[in-house]
Amino acid sequence: MSDQQTCVIDNGSGVVKAGFAGEDAPRAVFPSIVGRPKNVSALIGVDSASEYLGDEAQQKRGVLKIWNHTFYVELRVQPDEHPILLTEAPLSPKTNREKMTQIIFETFNLPALYVAIQAVLSLYSRGRTTGIVCDAGDGLTHTVPIYEGFSIPHAVSTIQLAGRDLTTFLAKLFTERGYNFTSSAELEIVRDIKEKLCFLALNYESALKQSHDSSQFEKNYELPHGKVITIGSERFRCPEYLFKPLEMNGRELDSIQDLTYKSIQECDVDVRRDLYQNIILSGGTTMYEGIGERLLKEIENRAPKSINVKVIASPDRRFAVWRGGSTLTSLSTFASMWITKEDYDENGASIVHRKCI
């Protein structure tokens, strides 16, 4: 299989990242949602496809349609000519893994497949095999402790608080200023504001006081139709939701720092020091300026004083999972890891549990 270029596909909760092994960044990055036009007359002059994949779509697309789009439209490859690495969320049910394996072999006739846990790939992208990955995407935030390349399932923690919740929360904060963003198109504008202007305050109370006393945090944002709006404390109040879900928006969830701390404490005492010293941020919702310093401060307040806590927030962490997959499949030692078509034909979909641990 050395002459066949490997495709690496990271199916995130909100965004698909796809490309080729050995490259530094994915070739294609697109939302994993689909919609059918509600009002066809409004789309006169637009390509009359019955389905649209991208930002304007409202429903999750079936995984089969996403893969079709990935192979034939985005990467422009014939899947039966390429080994494929797919990613999965931690604690994915066995039936899901088998179904994914079955669909991809039987529909696309792949020569070979490997399924890897997203957080493990994030760790590999930083050149590590032990650490705890805090992965915040669009739909979920996970903390996944990993020891010598294997995740520790009983210590994995998840909350349903991530990128889309922060977008909705920022829209709610804007209503207090008299700006109403409610339609899906308007929420896309809010998402853009969030990604471009929001940041984490190291000390929230201090930043809030400063924002009342001065205009130092205020920034202007030009809307598509030309109107300019001003935002101030919303810039740091929005992502504060990750650190104070109850106080900020009345949700009784673990904060991102409690989630991380609890996952570490669930692990054997002998590995905790290694985990505290290798806290890896991953995913688009960890891209806020200041988030690494803030998480470090919060974990240091909880960890034993004898431990030197370290949080790694690499600049490319939005694509950490994809890059880990690109790196892993490029290793010469990886060749024996693939589930080949022959393996699948001989053993069925359950082979995924033996080959992809």
From Swiss-Prot:
It is found in: Cytoplasm, Cytoskeleton. Transmembrane segments: none annotated. It catalyses: ATP + H2O = ADP + phosphate + H(+). GO terms for cellular component: cytoplasm; cytoskeleton. InterPro entries: Actin, Actin/actin-like_CS, Actin_CS, ATPase_NBD. Met-1 may be removed after translation. GO terms for molecular function: ATP binding; hydrolase activity. Keywords: ATP-binding, Cytoplasm, Cytoskeleton, Hydrolase, Nucleotide-binding. It holds the Pfam family Actin. Its EC number is 3.6.4.-. Disulfide bonds: none annotated. It comes from the Eukaryota. Belongs to the actin family. Actins are highly conserved proteins that are involved in various types of cell motility and are ubiquitously expressed in all eukaryotic cells. This is Actin, macronuclear. It comes from Oxytricha fallax.
